[in-house]
């Protein structure tokens, strides 16, 4: 992470420079800022070998409203965090299941085509979130720190919109690849606190194994 580069793109320079990130490093923050995060599971947006952009836009727009509402429903640990969070109203909409999407599209992760799809999908998410945030600014007002004399971008509800989180735990619950990362193993073993071992099998591999007739419990363990 390069803090000087990040500060060049600071959306609210009138409030000061970035000094930190949130715990996983995906969102730059001013002193006392916080950010509400959420992840869209891209595994659910493949249809007939293509990305279902119509449904994806609907979900992004809904998620933008939900994440913005969380700010107002939140309980903040100290007054300074509440004050800064309400000033900038940052949200961080991310993804998980990118590799799942590419598998369903039959596109290798890391290929030129795979990178093109990832870029197109994230730009689409970013644009749809910005569009909805601009609409929310017209309905409820822009984030309070917005200054039309300093900020050249169109008024919007949230100073930040997208952020790619690792989703290491929630992706396990959703049974998809974490964040924008590839699957690093076909079969994984998760050791839980009570000493149990959970065997986690890649569902796409299991489907192929069953279809081609080489599936067995021994293979999966």
How does the language model describe each region?
Residues 1-221:
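Long, C-terminal-biased catalytic regions of enzyme "large/alpha" subunits
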